[in-house]
């Protein structure tokens, strides 16, 4: 796992940063990433599987290597999608500000857009060095399920320039997928076949 090859060759001007546990990645993730890319004319959307996020317990998640493999399997859905193992390769907690700083160095001259949900937007003031983060990226807040990010703007300099992007309402969550797999249900409408194959091969999400 390493940085995708675009970092050393072609330099996309507009790059979305799409982080998540991706346990597993599903069709909802694919849909909203494409919606944001369309809305903001992004050249790339970098999918960033979380390694050791400081605010989330990962004791019951699939092994990191398999989450990375599943994420790599979904990026073929759109030519704008790439994956980076930047957080997966980092020892210790992964802070978004450190990821953004590293990607800023890897993609000199590129404009970075951090894609988050409304819940994350509300909590942004609790993140590590949020002011520095906002100096490195432009925020993209996904409005979905009737939630409007602009109604919950935290008091931080830089948030006034956030992009609020309506995305499709997709009634799929990673929890739904895990439950369906454990119950022996057909999950082809929830996840790409390549992800399903990894889940079956590894016996994931079965109690």
Which functions belong to the PLM regions below?
Residues 1-207:
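Nucleotidyltransferase catalytic core that binds NTPs
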